[in-house]
Amino acid sequence: MQVPSPSVREAASMYGTAVAVFLVILVAALQGSAPAESPFPFHIPLDPEGTLELSWNISYAQETIYFQLLVRELKAGVLFGMSDRGELENADLVVLWTDRDGAYFGDAWSDQKGQVHLDSQQDYQLLRAQRTPEGLYLLFKRPFGTCDPNDYLIEDGTVHLVYGFLEEPLRSLESINTSGLHTGLQRVQLLKPSIPKPALPADTRTMEIRAPDVLIPGQQTTYWCYVTELPDGFPRHHIVMYEPIVTEGNEALVHHMEVFQCAAEFETIPHFSGPCDSKMKPQRLNFCRHVLAAWALGAKAFYYPEEAGLAFGGPGSSRFLRLEVHYHNPLVITGRRDSSGIRLYYTAALRRFDAGIMELGLAYTPVMAIPPQETAFVLTGYCTDKCTQLALPASGIHIFASQLHTHLTGRKVVTVLARDGRETEIVNRDNHYSPHFQEIRMLKKVVSVQPGDVLITSCTYNTEDRRLATVGGFGILEEMCVNYVHYYPQTQLELCKSAVDPGFLHKYFRLVNRFNSEEVCTCPQASVPEQFASVPWNSFNREVLKALYGFAPISMHCNRSSAVRFQGEWNRQPLPEIVSRLEEPTPHCPASQAQSPAGPTVLNISGGKG
């Protein structure tokens, strides 16, 4: 390392010693969270060209992430970091930059105008810089939380990673403005759970559900649907694991994939391979909604608990499967063919329990709505104590995975378990949720739900760009608030959701009419969306709607797998009484690290190690 000033020389000397120590203890520090064959088990391409590739591992004991960034073609430097929604403004960054004299690595941040500043608290610590035939490798680490106001708090949910390329040497770091750079974003879950892999049964077999040599369309976004079928007479099996198969060279284009089983009520489903929004798509494909497997960029293999498996095949189960592949092609690359898909691992030796999937949250109904121009409007759905008392077995159920779901305006989703009126634990939470990144996530800890418990699912929405109210429903411009929880043992309870009582919503429309000069159409022939569309969205009408959702009785959907409600009275039910709420977690501030550099690290990246 070449050091241009005494202050930086002193920091670099201390730091050089620390680097040697870190490299010796790195594998030990990560032991238990990485397979023996790789200290960096998680990988994603950051940019469509494959110039930047990120690998990482997690030390939960140290509350630290170790990153390895491969820069295949380095010009004058790169930016990498995180931000709330993937913007380059107000971003937490680490920057490799060059001037006429040398190269530097430093912790930085950007302000609301995209101007980059060196961070006074250097929380990204460089451990190694090495040139190889593949490119430049940068190994560095970062605590989950730093308590630095300019830093991003790394949490369990979605993280929006950002990157940018520097084309020419700089006079100084402060001369960077992100608005003039070639930049991009990638979404990923960084904090993967550290769960031991269960052993697979001796009779495990595999089945590949793959796209049939698809010519990826030359457009930015494509959802491709492909229908295939199980062999005739395929008996009942348990899926015990699945993993992605991504065609080599397409790693940056295949964004996520799902395998759905079709409804058993149809004896046949027409074969189809084409865009999911094609007018040629058979209508029956809309009834292929039962999720067997789901994968998103950055995820690895999904294992079921040793005591449970997901049943498919046999009597009462459809032979037809639908593969859906989301191609993300921002550079509009043409001529690329793809056969990506999902490999299912299954066994004929059925495990003790069938795994089930239950829907929590809000019913798909327009009575739940978000006013326009809202930055953080919250809607909440309930799975009530009355429903769980009636529908769950005496021994309860065990939730081991979860898939959160909203449409385009969703920003946060959380499901909380409450018992005896007190919130006790988080089932799943994503404070940076994106509707463009949905995956089934293993829970770090299995959540046990007992009869009489309450499951509360809340979604936060942003409708700043909308002129009319956004109502609940199936359409992509309508909204949902759902948590698909994966659990065992399977029960008859498939859907446990709520919505405000329609009669109380009608009272809201009458109240709006009484206190506003503009008349809201409440005539019998007017639909709920039409009535919401005629509401003048002043502060009074917004606050009253918010209050209504917070106290009005609810209509409960406590449904069997046959879509029929369990016997009982489910309309005009009181909201569950919650007397104690969980406190928001307080970020842990790591102790001041004497080995952290006081300023940027100076590198020699012409070859060898820095």
Swiss-Prot record:
Binds 2 copper ions per subunit. Residues 50-166 form the DOMON domain. It comes from the Eukaryota. The record marks G32, S33 as: Cleavage. CDD domains: DOMON_DOH. Its EC number is 1.14.17.1. The active site is at Y223, H405. Keywords: Catecholamine biosynthesis, Copper, Cytoplasmic vesicle, Disulfide bond, Glycoprotein, Membrane, Metal-binding, Monooxygenase, Oxidoreductase, Signal-anchor, Transmembrane, Transmembrane helix, Vitamin C. The chain crosses the membrane at residues 10-30. It holds the Pfam family DOMON. GO terms for cellular component: centriolar satellite; chromaffin granule lumen; chromaffin granule membrane; endoplasmic reticulum; extracellular space; secretory granule lumen; secretory granule membrane; transport vesicle membrane. Proteolytic cleavage after the membrane-anchor leads to the release of the soluble form. N-glycosylated. Cu(2+) A binds at H255, H256, H326. Pathway: Catecholamine biosynthesis; (R)-noradrenaline biosynthesis; (R)-noradrenaline from dopamine: step 1/1. It is an enzyme of class 1 (oxidoreductase). Glycans are attached at N177, N559. Its main location: membrane. Residues 585-610 are annotated as: Disordered. Belongs to the copper type II ascorbate-dependent monooxygenase family. Homotetramer; composed of two disulfide-linked dimers. This is Dopamine beta-hydroxylase. It comes from Bos taurus (Bovine). The lineage of its organism: Eukaryota, Metazoa, Chordata, Craniata, Vertebrata.
